[in-house]
Amino acid sequence: MKGYMYILLCSNGQYYTGSTNDMDRRLAEHQNGEGANFTRKHLPVELLYFEEFQRIDKAFYREKQIQGWSRKKKEALINGQTNELPKLAKKDFGK
């Protein structure tokens, strides 16, 4: 079963990362306040980015990976600046 990982922009300016096996249905649920508690409180939401996977578990793993990313790293992904991702992943422990 196919899966999708997606990033939404919520009305409070925060990103919401999720996964689903039906992108159209899930986006409609979020827009109608039937999605996650977080998006329900921050309507409307806008779909900014998604990736398609051959299996839903792969989409779920990708969701969990991206949820741990910084805002700047998520924005680089959304904006197609994948060459910036390694640099944004590095931590500066010297400061």
Predicted regions and their residues:
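Short arginine-rich
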Residues: 64-77
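GIY-YIG nuclease catalytic motif and its immediate N-terminal context
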Residues: 1-36, 40-52, 60-64, 82-95
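C2H2-type zinc-finger recognition helix
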Residues: 56
